[in-house]
Amino acid sequence: MALEKPQWKELFSEVVTSGLCTGCAACVIACPHPVLDYETDNGVYKPFHLDIDGGPEDCTHGQKGCTMCTRACPRFRNWESEIDTHKFARERTEDEVSGIGDVLLARATDESLVENGQDGGFVSALLIYALENDVIDAALVSGLEGDGSTWRAVPQVARSREDVIETAKSRYTYSANLLAYPEAAEGGAERIALVGMGCMASAPGAMQSRKAGKLARRLCLTIGLMCSKTFDDSIFEELFEAKYGIKRADILKMNIKGVFQIWTTDGHFHEVPLKEAHAFTREGCKQCPDFADEHADISTGGIGAFGDWTLVIVRTDQGRELMNAMKENGLIETRPGDDDPGAVALLHRLAIVSRKRWPEAAVPGPRRIPVVITYPSRH
């Protein structure tokens, strides 16, 4: 009996149209032919096949044996166990609620990065160090289209300190940062970092565990951004402007700290209750089980009591080596995670909530209701 070679047809039925697809675009950049593209209109954020003569699920290359799209997908079949085993040499236990790793707090020592970045500028400091010290050649990040006044997040490539500073701060509409990969590779980058939420952070591990070729080898570092959800672009006109009179072109900075915090160019500060934003949740986020980007090398989140510190989970030896080098060079300062027990408790709570999203019918998959455990901090 021939071995099964799952291809686009299976990916289309089991992930793309089942509600499990997060829109990460891993399948699109992995397609070698290429016959996959990406839909962003009307908040769709999903891959589609360009040649639909035989139907949207048909792929003549898949029928001939091409499996690259299913190798790249971080939500296809037994993805969690496969990636856990590849990255950590074991599957997680049921009480490892937010994945495998050590929790601490970190911030940049460069005050200009703290001021320009988000929650202490840690991610900016990390990317700048990696770019300037021959760790990576480029990073896949998100930026804002045009002059930034639309606040539409778009995939971009960062190759320098200036690029990192330009693309700092958070956006809360979706950007499939993996779509910037072709630009980075065509520009000669062989060692590429991916910065993204859990939906994207599992993609390199999926590709590597399933041997997806040069693409898998190039994605050498993953920095995760903790995320409960992102929002449809319509939130700007239909909520912020319609109810609060905040025009997107006037927004200077946004953050989420229990409420939607919005700073505007006229110097004013606004708070929008999160419950009012729930109706604008992006479709691809509704069944995502990964708040804590559990397959990143380093996961980061601004969920603590200290607004200028980042909650960090260091998950791999590569992540630890990078953290140690930055500390030795005086580029970051760290504190034990136990300094902010509320942040650690919130991390666990949000991780549990997100894991419960994964539908029971979609098996195998993430364990739905794990037990809470507190990890020792490295400092």
What label would you give each PLM region?
Residues 11-29:
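N-terminal basic/disordered segments at the start of proteins
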Residues 1-11, 29-55, 168-174, 254-271:
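Short, charged low-complexity linear segments at domain edges
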Residues 78-379:
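Iron-sulfur-associated redox domains of electron-transfer enzymes in respiratory
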